């Protein structure tokens, strides 16, 4: 998969204003995800929540004219340190979230390697290789910004 125009490999680190325990408490509110993030629709959880074996299903709508249907299978969830996941659907690959203590806050590290499986998006990846990366990065920026707001507002309660 490496070097393929269909693969988006990502690594990012973000400071968050709350401890790893507080971050985890907010992450557990899966029922709020669709209302938090305008790019997420048709969201549902099959399973007990933020635990291994659960599957998060939804549609991602980046600021481009396409939609991506995904199923995120939680492979391992170690509170409040790590989530490992397999991504399936219009994308296929792996993703990981690490939560490291950083003073009074948290350093969230995200890594993923996902292959675009949807035919129209594969064609777009060949014609405009940076387009999918741009859409991906806008979704990540929006997610982090909104999540910081919910942490500051005390949405863990």
PLM features: residue spans?
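Short loop segments at secondary-structure junctions
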Residues: 17-20, 78, 102-104
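Residue-level detector of alpha-helix boundaries and kinks
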Residues: 8, 18, 59, 84, ...
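Glycine-rich portal/gate segments that line the openings of hydrophobic small-molecule binding cavities
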Residues: 44-91, 107, 142-157
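Hydrophobic ligand-binding cavity/cleft-lining segments
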Residues: 1-51, 146, 155-157
